[in-house]
């Protein structure tokens, strides 16, 4: 069993819609356990730093403004093949292209307000988790077989 960790963010639109619990339940139902979780209002510097890889892209400024428009839920999810599992549960970045039953299909309204973020690789998951969480803030618990 390949136990991994990945970063998940419930974006401001998810909080506005009141679907935090529904989103976390979807992760848990698929075997991803939140091992660190925090509600936080990102500063502009935090959002710019986190999304620095997109700095040259035309949507960067709007993305940063959206991410600082309200609080977010930052989570570390742990489970078997967590990175891929999280991405499957979230669905395609564009909710219009997302599969039925995915978070983005059910809760997102546009590619800009797509409700959740998830790490796209194990390498990036490690970087993204370290950006928001110290190792002492992340906890594990036993897995049921």
From Swiss-Prot:
Major place of residence: cytoplasm
InterPro entries: NDK-like_dom, NDK-like_dom_sf, Nucleoside_diP_kinase, Nucleoside_diP_kinase_AS
Active site: residue positions: 117
GO molecular function: ATP binding; metal ion binding; nucleoside diphosphate kinase activity
Key words, A-Z: ATP-binding, Cytoplasm, Kinase, Magnesium, Metal-binding, Nucleotide metabolism, Nucleotide-binding, Phosphoprotein, Transferase
Annotated disulfide bonds: none
The EC number(s) this enzyme carries: 2.7.4.6
Keyword flag Kinase: yes
Biological function: Major role in the synthesis of nucleoside triphosphates other than ATP. The ATP gamma phosphate is transferred to the NDP beta phosphate via a ping-pong mechanism, using a phosphorylated active-site intermediate.
Record-linked NCBIfam families: PRK00668.1
Subunit structure: Homotetramer.
Protein's UniProt name: Nucleoside diphosphate kinase
Source organism per UniProt: Myxococcus xanthus
Lineage: Bacteria, Pseudomonadati, Myxococcota, Myxococcia, Myxococcales
Gene designation per UniProt: ndk
């Amino acid at each position: 069993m390949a136990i991994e960790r990945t970063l998940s963010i419930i974006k401001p639109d998810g909080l506005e819609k009141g679907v935090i619990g529904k989103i976390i339940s979807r992760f848990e139902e698929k075997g991803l356990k939140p091992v660190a979780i925090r509600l936080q209002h990102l500063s502009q510097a935090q959002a710019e730093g986190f999304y620095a890889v997109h700095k040259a892209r035309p949507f960067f400024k709007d993305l940063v403004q959206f991410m600082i428009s309200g609080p977010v839920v930052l989570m570390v999810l742990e489970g078997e093949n967590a990175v891929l599992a999280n991405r499957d549960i979230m669905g395609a970045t564009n909710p219009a292209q997302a599969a039925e039953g995915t978070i983005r299909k059910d809760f997102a309204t546009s590619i800009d307000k797509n409700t959740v973020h998830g790490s796209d690789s194990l390498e990036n998951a490690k970087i993204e988790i370290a950006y928001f969480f110290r190792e002492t803030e992340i906890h594990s618990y036993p897995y049921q077989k």
